[in-house]
Amino acid sequence: MKFERHLLLTLREELSKPTPVIHVLIGPRQVGKTTIALQIQESVKIPTIYATADSPVPLDSSWIETHWKRAVTESHASKSPVILILDELQKVKGWSETLKMLWDSRLGGPEIRVLILGSASLLMQEGLTESLAGRFFLHRCSHWS
């Protein structure tokens, strides 16, 4: 039997319907953020793309753009919305500006639902408040209890 946290149920429900915001899952390292994301990926009925920026080489905005294009292509092919999950996004240089540009350009295009994960809360929150104000909903993942 798999353990499912309440946060998983909340996020799965939110991402299974049209959403006007980017969902952001933040919390300390090793609390289960990636596990929740992978459980969402295997349990929703719409296509999901998962990518992690946890890389030994620095990544830039083209990494985000590549995965966004994958989501758009998948949405056209499947004729359905797509969930794009980007893990450890704070490691990508210029991530918030790039995501803002892509998010704002989606109107009239395929429905891309976005979940971003990050463990460096300060870096995530700075990017969220600077570029993505009004475009996100913050979910906090605490230690297992």
Name what the model sees in each region.
Residues 1-145:
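Phosphate-binding site recognition
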